[in-house]
Amino acid sequence: MTDKVKIIFLGDSITDADHNLYPGNPGEPCLGDGYVRQIADILQLRMPGRTDIRNGGHDGFTVQGLLRMLEHDCLSRRPDVVSVLIGSNDAAVCMNTGRTLEETYFAENYRALLGRVRGATEGCLVCMGPFIFPQPLEYSRWIPVIQEIEETERKIAAEHRALFIPLHNLLNRDAERSGYQRLTADGIHLTREGAEIVARAWIQETDRAGIFI
């Protein structure tokens, strides 16, 4: 393989992980201090010099924000692999305004997002479901909305022949065993240990699909 595999990660603050504050090595793109960096480190060991990874995460973004910035952040770069993790802020909109997912056009926007990616590239599309931790306890009220978003994303991902990785139960099962503070500081964002679980799940699923093998 002579050309580098172009991989773009799209998402909200969980993907962003302060990527403009953690520039990495000289000459490398800013990847942040979250799961994107951990995935990049794993792939660098496996495929040294053969990947071009970019972090397209934006703090506070909903799926509508990703759709608005899609051409700039993703399509113009002609990626081989696109990974999407979105939904936490969409859940926040519902919980803070009383609007439903239908009223925010979540499914329509998510379908449009994946459709535009699929229309521009025949590469691999990886979708990850949102998650929330019931610590602090007030976030337990968010769980039904998070689960509804997860199922919506799962269905639409299947329509677009995308891999789908459900994260909510995966992360919460681990948190129940090892303690919530190990994985999250605020119930939404991940610690290094939490990001490691996401990175490992992403690598396992893409390995299963034979993407980097």
How should these model regions be labeled?
Residues 9, 13-14, 23, 56-61, ...:
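Cell-envelope and extracellular/periplasmic
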Residues 22-29, 96-103, 140-144, 183-185:
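Short glycine-enriched, charge-decorated loop/helix-capping segments at active-site entrances
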Residues 102-129, 150-162:
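Charged, glycine-enriched surface loops/patches
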Residues 17-19, 64, 91-96, 134-138:
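A short acidic, helix-capping loop that chelates divalent metal ions and anchors anionic groups
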Residues 1-59, 69-78:
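Serine-esterase "nucleophile elbow" of acetyl-processing enzymes
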Residues 131-213:
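Catalytic His-Asp segment of secreted/periplasmic serine-dependent ester chemistry enzymes
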Residues 85-91, 114-148:
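Active-site segments of SGNH/GDSL-like serine hydrolases
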